[in-house]
Amino acid sequence: MAGTVVLDDVELREAQRDYLDFLDDEEDQGIYQSKVRELISDNQYRLIVNVNDLRRKNEKRANRLLNNAFEELVAFQRALKDFVASIDATYAKQYEEFYVGLEGSFGSKHVSPRTLTSCFLSCVVCVEGIVTKCSLVRPKVVRSVHYCPATKKTIERRYSDLTTLVAFPSSSVYPTKDEENNPLETEYGLSVYKDHQTITIQEMPEKAPAGQLPRSVDVILDDDLVDKAKPGDRVQVVGTYRCLPGKKGGYTSGTFRTVLIACNVKQMSKDAQPSFSAEDIAKIKKFSKTRSKDIFDQLARSLAPSIHGHDYVKKAILCLLLGGVERDLENGSHIRGDINILLIGDPSVAKSQLLRYVLCTAPRAIPTTGRGSSGVGLTAAVTTDQETGERRLEAGAMVLADRGVVCIDEFDKMSDMDRTAIHEVMEQGRVTIAKAGIHARLNARCSVLAAANPVYGRYDQYKTPMENIGLQDSLLSRFDLLFIMLDQMDPEQDREISDHVLRMHRYRAPGEQDGDAMPLGSAVDILATDDPNFSQEDQQDTQIYEKHDNLLHGTKKKKEKMVSAAFMKKYIHVAKIIKPVLTQESATYIAEEYSRLRSQDSMSSDTARTSPVTARTLETLIRLATAHAKARMSKTVDLQDAEEAVELVQYAYFKKVLEKEKKRKKRSEDESETEDEEEKSQEDQEQKRKRRKTRQSDAKDGDSYDPYDFSDTEEEMPQVHTPKTADSQETKESQKVELSESRLKAFKVALLDVFREAHAQSIGMNRLTESINRDSEEPFSSVEIQAALSKMQDDNQVMVSEGIIFLI
């Protein structure tokens, strides 16, 4: 505060006169005179002034305003009140004070919470950041009026503290007695209060230095500025930077607390928008028309070019970046347009790398991990302010990523309670808090891209997908697509991957020096609340395709062009704005395919669903088809979009399950060998050959082979051949014998008579054979008895276990 200049009355009046001349610009363009008239008609009391206009008209006064804010703003606000009174005297008397808010170019005083240092104290600064904490709105007394019944006099007292522009704070003692110790009564109707709120602004994650904690600054909002921002909003706050003395035990300590007293709060765009030129728009239109047939495949191939394969996953991530169409119906229902994807698979299949690519490509993305995140850390938390002791709301990762993407790695490491906390966010797109006396609803309209490992560490192909995934159905149904990514052993594919990885390690970007760290920043920041000096000089010509590099893209016979990352960002940004409409043809096709999906699990026995097919799947098909239409820059969702969406869902929802060969049980060595032992061994050899061929073909299809499965080698090891018993031979033969209807009916009648005579629910096989054939004219052979019992067991009429027949 050493640099602060206290103005005397003469200088204050001179400053007030300069500001009044600036506002009274009727002879010039009349901008601020019309603004003041609008302020009166809108019943407002804060005028937004552009610093550039003041600098153009009175540069000396503008510099003083930025460097000695408190006294200059007091003079500016008095001048504003005088100017309002000259236009409408009655309106000027309605409000105690009129406020001035600033905008425009602040140059070196346009800072972030990290660069806001002590040299800016008592200056006007513009701070950018994300609102992370938000206190409750409290009333603060400005003027209290007290009535003394004994003397019948009225006493008035004004209050000011260090958060106001007045240089010296008044006494905070609330009067209860007058000078003669007569009791006073407070006239609450005549007293004046103003709203007061404290928010905390944190620096933006994309601008924070890597490996350092983000810094924050407290901002004080008064009167009409309260509730201008909520947790998760990106804002620019213009205000005066001030230090407040810290007190401990009634004494002022040497450490000071700094706050920003706001005079203007401006909402920034939710997205970090890329800057567009007319040429960029023309290129985007031309690209969408010339590549209209395979534009979706072209864009999907260009996603994460450093990752080999995973074509369907890349298509799904492109759909996630484009998104569907969000709808709010008249009855209050909300249909989300965000697409959620879960990647589950073996280690080292590039799940985390895909997440990192989305972080770099999406306009707004926040990374988090399952082990390092809690449920309230992802949604919102109610915390206690250490200084005031009051409750405040703190936004989590999903609220901060509103209209963006949340990337959650190691999703399986989260606890069930924390995973349950994100259910509402994934479907409704909002967070509802009702705890500690705070009831709030925050927007969290974000897409979720999660990566997880299977339950057993690696994916077991002999178990169903649901057993491998190990997540609740209620959570899985909220993911639009669930991809199972396997590390399969295929010599040809392994050769391609090794070639690809080696090329990536040999590649070096142009101009990269030895040992240089890769730059993490983006384009040049604009040090103003607006971008008035936008020119084409800063714009580089955005190339549609990347220049082909043999190391980066490989030497293929058919050179596939890769869309550049810069053009991809701009194309996705433009495509997201389009809102396609479903055609009748595509709607009918989606409805038919949805009903087919519901019954598809009963068609083939060797496939199983990765996630439940519910009504949400129908919305998934619509969202994916809409995203495909956005990629084509189409205003309608056509049949080809619906077909592509169905193909994605078919690939993601069903996974083949292998059947394990039953291992033979070892029998005792003293059992005699049967005559057909040699034939059996030959059959086994043939079956093994067939199985090996089948598995090799499956591996080529990319569907079944597991590099850690040694079932083939186990079967090829020498095994002890076990002889067949007579019972097993009869059982096999009984499956070949077919009983006639009359013969089966006679057996059932005879069986029922045997159970009635025995007065029991179970009977042995030997006893049954004797009892049935005792009085029978045509006795039943043991093979017929086995066949009849097998038939009755299939019909759930009897149960055979260890030679005992149970009547059901």
UniProtKB/Swiss-Prot annotation:
Biased composition annotated in UniProt, kind: Acidic residues: 670-681, 704-717
Cell cycle among keywords: yes
Annotated residues for binding of ADP: 353, 393-395, 397
Biological-process GO terms, alphabetical: DNA strand elongation involved in DNA replication; double-strand break repair via break-induced replication; mitotic DNA replication initiation
Modification type N6-acetyllysine: residues: 293, 547
SS bonds (residue pairs): none
Phosphothreonine found at: 674, 713, 722, 725
Sequence motif Arginine finger, location on chain: 477-480
Basic and acidic residues bias: start-end ranges: 727-738
PROSITE patterns membership: MCM_1 (PS00847), MCM_2 (PS50051)
N-acetylalanine: modified positions: 2
Keywords: Acetylation, ATP-binding, Cell cycle, Chromosome, DNA replication, DNA-binding, Glycoprotein, Helicase, Hydrolase, Nucleotide-binding, Nucleus, Phosphoprotein
Example of a GO cellular component annotation carried by this entry: MCM complex
Catalyses which reaction(s): ATP + H2O = ADP + phosphate + H(+)
Annotated MCM domain residues: 295-502
Region of interest (Disordered), ranges: 662-738
GO molecular function: ATP binding; ATP hydrolysis activity; single-stranded DNA binding; single-stranded DNA helicase activity
Residues involved in ATP binding: 523, 664
Subunit structure and binding partners: Component of the MCM2-7 complex. The complex forms a toroidal hexameric ring with the proposed subunit order MCM2-MCM6-MCM4-MCM7-MCM3-MCM5. Component of the CMG helicase complex, a hexameric ring of related MCM2-7 subunits stabilized by CDC45 and the tetrameric GINS complex. Associated with the replication-specific DNA polymerase alpha. Interacts with MCMBP. Interacts with ANKRD17. Interacts with MCM3AP isoform MCM3AP; this interaction leads to MCM3 acetylation.
Protein role: Acts as a component of the MCM2-7 complex (MCM complex) which is the replicative helicase essential for 'once per cell cycle' DNA replication initiation and elongation in eukaryotic cells. Core component of CDC45-MCM-GINS (CMG) helicase, the molecular machine that unwinds template DNA during replication, and around which the replisome is built.
Name of the protein described by the UniProt record: DNA replication licensing factor MCM3
Organism: Pongo abelii (Sumatran orangutan)
